[in-house]
Regions:
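Bacterial N-terminal signal peptides
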Residues: 7-16
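Acidic-and-aromatic substrate-binding clefts and catalytic sites of carbohydrate-active enzymes
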Residues: 37-42, 57-70, 93-94, 132-135, ...
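Residues at the N-termini of beta-strands
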Residues: 57, 123, 218, 262-263
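N-terminal pre-domain/capping segments
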Residues: 2-5, 19-117, 156, 187, ...
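Short acidic/histidine-rich active-site segments
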Residues: 263-269
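Active-site acidic/histidine proton-transfer and metal-coordination neighborhood
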Residues: 22-24, 95-191, 249
Length: 289
């Protein structure tokens, strides 16, 4: 009788543990990019709208000509600017063949770090380089690493994380390659700004967390639908979050395994109040697994 009761209790414990594991949601804070908020409104009114809709934060470009307005709007509404996106990393590539261009890129990157600190943000999103007709994969690697290192003392001084985003730049397209690059920079302040939708065309997003682990600093959120052979691959981003080929339950499961918690920022086509509300609803559903 005692053994029966013991077995029953153990069975109930295991069942409840599995149920709790299944129902536990990722501790996510939801944000969007400032440029997604459309309409003829002041910066302050846009911050008010985002706050009203229930977003936890917002991300802005830096350097920016609206620096003071962004900070004032954040303070007035209580909506935190959790991070900034380096606004110079495409025009002034850190992998550019010309040293003068790379130097300008570093200057823009360092200003983004200063702006992040000014806002009370914790990170700068950075695209580290690009492979093109002028730059091979190996050259992009060898040129960009030293340039990023130049900004690391400032990042350390101001305690700003550098999140390297995986984008369609033909560079760092796998989690293994991304981790190797991060490890070569050898700084606790350098990690991955993991863009979930950007990987779907190349590989399964759910395979990234197990490789990168705690090097995933933040998440960019978009959806993607794989296109037929010969089709316009950019059309794949037209689908709403949750309506594409991304396996959100698998992504959530893998993020839980590495104990991810923190920011998930939408990077999709924005719009008016109704559209922004829809995006937040779709994100919450995607991360509910």
């Amino acid at each position: 009788m005692t053994m029966r009761i013991l077995c029953l209790l153990m069975s109930l414990f295991i069942s409840s543990s599995l149920l709790a594991e299944k129902s536990e949601k990722l501790p996510i804070k939801f944000a969007l990019k400032f440029g997604m908020v459309k309409g003829k409104m002041s910066i302050l009114d846009k911050f008010k709208l985002v706050k009203e809709l229930g977003y936890d934060g917002i991300e802005v470009n830096a350097p920016s000509g609206s620096r003071e307005e962004f900070k004032a709007a954040s303070e007035a509404t209580g909506l935190p600017i959790h991070g900034v996106v380096c606004s110079t990393h495409w025009k002034l590539l850190l992998s550019h063949p010309e040293a003068a261009t790379r130097a300008k890129g570093v200057a823009g990157f360092e200003q983004a770090i200063r702006d992040a600190h000014f806002y009370g943000a914790s990170s700068v999103l950075l695209v580290p380089g690009k492979v093109n007709k002028d730059t091979t994969y190996e050259e992009a690697w060898k040129r960009s690493i030293p340039e990023i290192r130049k900004a690391l003392p400032l990042a350390k001084e101001l305690n700003i994380q550098i999140g390297l985003e995986n984008v369609w730049n033909d560079f760092l397209k796998t989690p293994e390659g991304t981790l190797k690059y991060i490890n070569e920079l050898d700084s606790p302040l350098v990690g991955s700004y993991f863009d979930i939708g950007n990987t779907v065309r190349y590989n399964d997003p759910s395979t990234w967390p197990s490789v990168l682990g705690n090097k995933i600093f933040k998440l960019d959120v978009k959806e993607y639908k794989r296109q037929p052979e010969g089709g316009n691959v950019w059309k794949g981003f037209k689908v709403k979050i949750g309506a594409g080929d991304n396996d959100w339950p698998a992504v959530c499961r893998e993020l839980k395994k590495v104990n991810y918690s923190g920011w998930a920022t939408a990077e999709v086509g924005g719009g008016d109040k109704k559209r922004l509300a829809e995006i937040l609803t779709n994100m919450r559903k995607a991360f509910s697994h």
